[in-house]
Every structure is written in structure tokens, then in C-alpha cells.
């Protein structure tokens, strides 16, 4: 059965992402995981970090990958399938690589449920739009928006992966202590890993030139930017010798 594009759920999903991003800024509190786990009640149920991240991120890969699996296989098919493939690439890494290498603290179960719901909804939104709604001109692969967007996506993913590697090296298996991250973009900002992911989704929004991707990029900027800000405050409070020239998210600016 052929699926027809319906604009109403696309608009509703995009509006929800924008609202969630704005809500994160309005509340202005860090999500209670990682460095900020203490913000939750001690009795809160927690899962090991690796299992938690795997379960939370899996829908963002499985849902769009399932949609892609129903499409004809082609390396350079319709732009929507290629762009959704980039989305799947990011979440393949987050689900099957990042989660298994994670050395973080146990993750609150309530946040896993929220994260899983978000990842499922966003995976459906991005996949549905790109496969069933998006229309691109014949020359989209040579359009500057596609080229620059894919470049930013790959650049951001590289920054994100490299920054996560630096963070993992700060802690031996079983350790829960914190150290000052050094190297890479951590030389300039406290949230280098967050900056990389924000760049990724800005690139994705540019390459797809779509409302759902733009809404997701806005949400990522709000949520991850706020988390970078709180990480920066955490480091300044914990380490007296923390580099004063280092910013939270944007080198030399913020």
C-alpha cells in the first residue's frame, strides 16, 4: 500500500520539537543524568549507562532504518533516501558504538522512557517526511545547500566522535571521578561534544532543507546548548584551575 504524505502530522511534529526546545530554555535546568544525576532523588531507579543509552537511542536508528528498508536500494537514489541514510548513520554510531563504549554513571529510568519516546517520535517524523513528503529538484546533489549541509554534518559528527573519545580517556573503567578535558575543541569550549552534534544537525537541516530537520536542529541547539552551559558551570565550580579563557559552547564568544 502506497503511503500518502499528510502535512498535518509533519507540522504538528515540527511544532512539538520547537516547543520542547523552547521549554528546555525556559526551565533552564540540566537533565538529571551524567554530571547532573544528583539533581534527581536518590531513590530514583537507574540502569547501567551502556544499556540505558542503547535502549534510548535505538528507536532513532531502527525506525528510519525500517522505513529505508522498504525503499529500492540505490547508492544515489532520491535525495530523501540518501539524507535519511545520514540520519541513520549518526544513530547507528550512537546506538551500537557510543553506547557500548560509554563509561558514564547509571542512568535514571524515567529519563530513558522520556528519551525513548522522543527518539521514536523524531525518528518517525524525519523518516516520514524525507521518504513520503520531501521533493527535491534533479540537481539537488550539486546544490550548495546539499553540499555545504553534508560537509557540516560530517564535520560535526567527526568533532562529536573525537570529543567523546577524549572524554572516555579521562576515566578508567569503574571510575566516577571527573577530570578537566584537554585537547581538540575542548581547548576552547567545555561542551565540544555538544558543539559537534549541534553542527551536525544544522548541516542536516541545510542539506534536507526541511521544516522537521530545522525544528530538530533548533531543539538540539536549545537542549545541548543548555547542557553545555551547565557543564561549563560544573567545571568552573569543581576545578579552581579550570581554564578561564575556555567558553561553554562557542569558542571565544559563549
Swiss-Prot record:
Swiss-Prot/TrEMBL keywords: Differentiation, Disease variant, Endoplasmic reticulum, Lipid metabolism, Membrane, Microsome, NADP, Oxidoreductase, Pseudohermaphroditism, Sexual differentiation, Transmembrane, Transmembrane helix
Any GO molecular function: testosterone dehydrogenase [NAD(P)+] activity
Subcellular location: Microsome membrane; Endoplasmic reticulum membrane
Effect of residue 49 to T: Increased affinity for testosterone; no effect on affinity for NADPH; increased Vmax
Catalytic function, reaction form: a 3-oxo-5alpha-steroid + NADP(+) = a 3-oxo-Delta(4)-steroid + NADPH + H(+); 17beta-hydroxy-5alpha-androstan-3-one + NADP(+) = testosterone + NADPH + H(+); 5alpha-pregnane-3,20-dione + NADP(+) = progesterone + NADPH + H(+)
Recorded consequence of changing residue 48 to R: Increased affinity for testosterone; increased affinity for NADPH; decreased Vmax
Annotated consequence of substituting residue 30 to L: Increased affinity for testosterone; increased affinity for NADPH; decreased Vmax
Residue stretches spanning the membrane: 8-28, 72-92, 146-166, 206-226
Membrane protein topology class: Multi-pass membrane protein
GO cellular component: cell body fiber; endoplasmic reticulum membrane; neuronal cell body
Tissue distribution of the protein: Expressed in high levels in the prostate and many other androgen-sensitive tissues.
Effect of residue 234 to L: Increased affinity for testosterone; increased affinity for NADPH; decreased Vmax and
Listed EC numbers: 1.3.1.22
Phenotype when changing residue 5 to R: No effect on affinity for testosterone; no effect on affinity for NADPH; no effect on Vmax
GO annotation, biological process: androgen biosynthetic process; androgen metabolic process; biphenyl metabolic process; bone development; cell differentiation; cell-cell signaling; dibenzo-p-dioxin metabolic process; female genitalia development
EC class of the enzyme, as a word: oxidoreductase
Family statement drawn from the similarity comment of this UniProt entry: Belongs to the steroid 5-alpha reductase family.
Function: Converts testosterone (T) into 5-alpha-dihydrotestosterone (DHT) and progesterone or corticosterone into their corresponding 5-alpha-3-oxosteroids. It plays a central role in sexual differentiation and androgen physiology.
Stored PANTHER family: 3-OXO-5-ALPHA-STEROID 4-DEHYDROGENASE, 3-OXO-5-ALPHA-STEROID 4-DEHYDROGENASE 2
Noted disease: Pseudovaginal perineoscrotal hypospadias: A form of male pseudohermaphroditism in which 46,XY males show ambiguous genitalia at birth, including perineal hypospadias and a blind perineal pouch, and develop masculinization at puberty. The name of the disorder stems from the finding of a blind-ending perineal opening resembling a vagina and a severely hypospadiac penis with the urethra opening onto the perineum.
Protein's name according to its UniProt entry: 3-oxo-5-alpha-steroid 4-dehydrogenase 2
Lineage summary: Eukaryota, Metazoa, Chordata, Craniata, Vertebrata
Designated gene of the protein: SRD5A2
Amino acid at each position: 500500500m502506497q503511503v500518502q504524505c499528510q502535512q498535518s502530522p509533519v507540522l504538528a511534529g515540527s511544532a512539538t520539537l520547537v516547543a520542547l526546545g523552547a521549554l528546555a530554555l525556559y526551565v533552564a535546568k540540566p537533565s538529571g543524568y551524567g554530571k547532573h544525576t544528583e539533581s534527581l532523588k536518590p531513590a530514583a531507579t537507574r540502569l547501567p549507562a551502556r544499556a540505558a543509552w542503547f535502549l534510548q537511542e535505538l528507536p532513532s536508528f531502527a525506525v528510519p532504518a525500517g522505513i529505508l528498508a522498504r525503499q529500492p536500494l540505490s547508492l544515489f537514489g532520491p535525495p530523501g533516501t540518501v539524507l535519511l541514510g545520514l540520519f541513520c548513520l549518526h544513530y547507528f554510531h550512537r546506538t551500537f558504538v557510543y553506547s557500548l563504549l560509554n563509561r558514564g554513571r547509571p542512568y535514571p529510568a524515567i529519563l530513558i522512557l522520556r528519551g525513548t519516546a522522543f527518539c521514536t517520535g523524531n525518528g518517525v517524523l524525519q523518516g516520514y517526511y524525507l521518504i513520503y513528503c520531501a521533493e527535491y529538484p534533479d540537481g539537488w546533489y550539486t546544490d550548495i545547500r546539499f553540499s555545504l549541509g553534508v560537509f557540516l554534518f560530517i564535520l560535526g559528527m567527526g568533532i562529536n566522535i573525537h570529543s567523546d573519545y577524549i572524554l572516555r580517556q579521562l576515566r578508567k573503567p569503574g571510575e566516577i571521578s571527573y577530570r578537566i578535558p584537554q585537547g581538540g575543541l575542548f581547548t576552547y569550549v567545555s561542551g565540544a561534544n555538544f558543539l559537534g552534534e549541534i553542527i551536525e544537525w544544522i548541516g542536516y537541516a541545510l542539506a534536507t532543507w526541511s521544516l522537521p530537520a530545522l525544528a530538530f536542529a533548533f531543539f538540539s541547539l536549545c537542549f545541548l546548548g543548555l547542557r553545555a552551559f551547565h557543564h561549563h558551570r560544573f567545571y568552573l565550580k569543581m576545578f579552581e584551575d579550570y581554564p578561564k579563557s575556555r567558553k561553554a559552547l562557542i569558542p571565544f564568544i559563549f
